[in-house]
C-alpha cells in the first residue's frame, strides 16, 4: 500500500479461469488489504474478467489496458497463467517494468524468469502434489461409496525471487 492516498489494485482473470476459487482469493485479499490499511490510506479494488472465447482476446485486452489514456493500476493480480504471461510481456513492451507491481499465477518458465528478472514481484501457485492426493482420495471415496461430497482446500504458495529455484525442473536449475 502507498504510504498516503489510494492504492489501486486490479484483479484480472479470463472467463475460463473465473471460478469459485478466484472469488475466494479476491475476497481474502480484499479482507487482508482492508485490515492492513492505516489512517490516510485507501484501497481501490477492481475486478475484470476478460471474455476469452476467441483467440488473442486476453492479449488484446491487456494491450488496450496499457495503451489507453487511463492510468494503470498500482497493482495487478493475475488470476491465471495466460493473464500472467500477457501482463509480463506488456510490462516489457510498454516500458512499465517497476511502475506496476504484478502478482502472477502459477509457475511456468516465463513466470519464473519474470520473477528472477524483477519484471513481476511474485506469483501464487497451488500445491499440485496436494491436488493429486486429494483427487485420488475423492476417486477412492467415489468408488467405495458411489459419491464424493468433500470440499478439499488446497494450500497456496507464494513464489518470490528467493525461491524460484524450488519450482524449476532439474534441467532448468
Language model: regions and residue ranges:
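Cofactor-binding loop segments of dinucleotide-utilizing enzymes, especially the Rossmann-like FAD-
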Residues: 14, 105-107, 161
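Beta-alpha-beta core module
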Residues: 110-120
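Short beta-strand elements in bilobed, periplasmic/extracellular small-molecule ligand-binding domains
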Residues: 8-11, 30-56, 155
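Short histidine/acidic/glycine/proline-rich micro-motifs that form metal-
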Residues: 14-20
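Loop/turn elements at helix/coil->beta-strand transitions in domains of secreted/extracellular proteins
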Residues: 4-9, 36-44, 71-75, 98-101, ...
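Hydrophobic alpha-helical segments within soluble ligand-binding/sensing domains
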Residues: 1-10, 24, 28-31, 55-59, ...
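Hydrophobic alpha-helical
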Residues: 29, 44-46, 50-112
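Hinge/cleft segment of the Venus flytrap/periplasmic-binding protein
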Residues: 36, 127-173
